[in-house]
Design a protein with these regions (language model features):
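Histidine-centered metal-chelating micro-motifs
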Residues: 61-63, 81, 98, 102-109
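Ligand-binding loop in jelly-roll beta-barrel domains
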Residues: 89, 103-127
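A short, N-terminal "cap"/entry segment at the start of jelly-roll beta-barrel domains
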Residues: 2-50, 91, 99, 129-135
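Structural recognition of the beta-strand scaffold that forms the well-ordered cores
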Residues: 64, 73-75, 99-100, 120
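Glycine- and acidic-residue-biased ligand/ion/polar-headgroup-sensing regions
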Residues: 67-86, 96
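A short beta-loop-beta micro-motif enriched in histidine and acidic residues
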Residues: 46-47, 60-74
Length: 135
């Protein structure tokens, strides 16, 4: 009976902490939207290309995260402050691009007064989440 109670308490604790983590991530991503446009297998086994449209409200923040592969992004509209670990922060505007190597922690903020729109292409490991929050 003690084991059943212990398992129940552990399960409830894990569920509560998991829910708090999801709420925290959602709050961090307020004003951020990623819409998948295309996904396709590559000629390299276990890899796929994913193309997404990203929209970030004025003053919106993309929390620090990683990808299981490379990211190449073109800024269609707006201005962003991009922070990529190991590099100086960059402020980029429409018409500019940035690249993030696989597994490198990065994030950003819309520093403009209008929504920012981006086109991002990811070359990632198939079957893994496209983005994982940084720890």
């Amino acid at each position: 009976m003690k084991n059943v109670k212990l398992i129940l308490v552990a399960t409830l604790t894990a569920a509560t902490l998991g829910a708090l983590g999801i709420q925290s991530l959602s709050a961090q991503q307020a004003g951020f939207k990623r819409v998948e446009l295309q996904r396709g297998d590559l000629s390299v086994a276990g890899r796929e290309a994913v193309v997404v449209r990203v929209e970030l409200d004025a003053d919106g923040i993309v929390g620090r995260h990683t990808h299981p592969g490379e990211e190449s992004t073109f800024i269609i509209e707006g201005s962003l402050l991009i922070e990529i670990n190991g590099k100086a922060p960059m402020t980029l505007s429409a018409g500019e691009t940035f690249f993030v190597p696989a597994g490198v922690i990065h994030g950003g903020k819309n520093v403009g007064k209008t929504p920012a729109k981006l086109l991002a292409t990811y070359i990632v490991e198939k079957g893994k989440p496209l983005a994982t929050p940084a720890k």
